Amino acid sequence: MDKKYYQLLKNQFSSKEAVLTEIINLSAICELPKATEHFMSDVHGEYDAFNHVLRNGSGSIKEKLRDCFPEFSATEISSLATLIYYPQEKLDSECQLKETEEFENYCRINLVYLLKTVKFVGQKYTRSKVRKAFPEKFRYILEELINEVDSTTDKRDYFDSILSQLQNLGEFTRLIVALADTIRRLTVDHLHVVGDIYDRGPYPDKIIDRLIKMPSVDVQWGNHDIVWMAAFSGSPLAMMNVIRICARYGNLDILEESYGINLRMILEYAERYYEPSEAFQPRLVEGVRLSDDEKALLNKLQEATAILQFKLESQLIKRRPDFQLEHRDVLHFIDFSEKTIKLGTEVYELTDFQAPTVNPEQPESLTAEEEKIISHLLNNFRSSDKLKRHVEFLQEKGAMYLSYNGNLLIHGCLPLHENGDFKSFTVNKEAHAGRDLLDFFDQEVRKCLAHPENSTDLATDLMWYLWVGECSSLFGKTAMTTFERYYIKDKKTHVEKKNPYYQLREEAEIIRKILENFGLDEGGHLVNGHTPIKEKNGENPIKADGKLIVIDGGFAKAYQKETGIAGYTILYNSFGIQLVAHQPFSTVKEAVEKGTDIISLKCLVAEVDQRKRVKDTNVGQTLLSEIADLEVLFEHYEEF
């Protein structure tokens, strides 16, 4: 028994009775129903769709409303749901449509509905937790109103008097907004983002700003997140890749406007050395309009950053033989006089290949001008306060994987051999496989983030390996064929052969083996993102007899034509796990004015035999440990 520990613990309580009260309180909490977890993945900068799914709780808010108000029509449910999703926008819309008296009556009626909804959704939480979910300035009055919302005639006048006074003071709208926010917070308790916040879509920064404000959230890093983290943390190679992808999808505003990164030097460089090429046409999502000059500039910038990326990658491949990336040293395979490249035993013609600054004798070498541009850009990335804040959030809330409430969350894969054995990755004569491999990567990511002044150390280079490496759990293919897709017409060179994991994950025994490696039993599930599920072709996101769920379904508009839907999410509550499929989101304006919602189709993945309690969760295990310590303290209180 650690006497000093228990003496410190005793100092937190005023008396022995206070210890007993805490034991009773924590024990009671352990018996409450498990709170709802919400899983999202591969949101790729699509803020409006992401924000809407957060606000509607993947359809769970409408479900709560139907349970709370069984007498309501579908139209009434939809109208009340919209008020909860977008309270300020809905109130503004109704205010414009209604006369003053009619609007005040609308507010009074809906305020009562929202009070009843809070009472309904909060019934599985302690009163303390519900109280803390209220804005502080409304805490007392809302608690009073909720307690009396269903009161009988004895206290009806008391309740009505409070409402009338609030109406006279003009507080109805503020209370409605506060209640709507509370309902959303209580309906979904915790959010998991299983990777890929960045790239393709226009607003990854707005997504992270939204996540920072959330009370309970975690992130499993995706490959697109890692490459941005690496760009901030000193990797010139990752930085070139980030700029190239932003140019490819017409999203330079993310860099220049959102993060305040000055691109003038590299834009001037691209204009000076490159001509537009068909393969580098920007891929613009529907609705984005650019002038011909703007498209040409993005085209040239994409070409310039691609060549700089290949130069820097060649340097990394040379200094990191452990990475076994020699087959990707593409600049050294080129016959510059013939404009051909030898890949393996085959020779291919290069189409529209421009390399005005490449020295055929030393293709990886940078010119003095390029060295200056890269140094300038690295400084600009490191100097962005907003990007710094976002990377720090990803570091604090993120990891390579998460084991939570019996489930394992990994963005991409766990590298395997064809026989199902864990594939090892050897660095500095140390082999890493399975969970140990992901722990190793996690450790190195944090080393890189701690030292952004380093650009060529092992930790920084491993950030790039996580983007392109065969044994990377975030990539898991033999090669990333960026060069081939740009310059070679023969599409067989574009194929990126996947790690056997992606076939073997259909087998329940393989998933059980992975779960066991991470200390989880066969009652758990593995959740992946990363690979879009092509539902329109009949692909099923539920695999391995329900042990594996893949939830990359196409939040990114660029992929929706391939997938046929606009994303999957998961809800895990005390009754089991539901998979939710979403249709494309239109606009907030349409959602408010017409009550349109992302159509959500739910499918039960796993139903529990007994309703899950808090004691069955990670939080519950912590509480049970605290209770055990408090029981020792209570029993020996006088001794300490």
UniProtKB/Swiss-Prot annotation:
Pfam families the UniProt entry points to: FBPase_2
Q: Which domain of life is it from?
A: Bacteria
Provide the catalytic activity annotation. Answer: beta-D-fructose 1,6-bisphosphate + H2O = beta-D-fructose 6-phosphate + phosphate
| Pathway recorded for this protein | Carbohydrate biosynthesis; gluconeogenesis
EC main group:
hydrolase
The family classification in the record reads: Belongs to the FBPase class 3 family.
Recorded hits in HAMAP family, A to Z, give:
FBPase_class3
Protein name, please?
Fructose-1,6-bisphosphatase class 3
Species assigned in the record: Lactococcus lactis subsp. lactis (strain IL1403) (Streptococcus lactis)
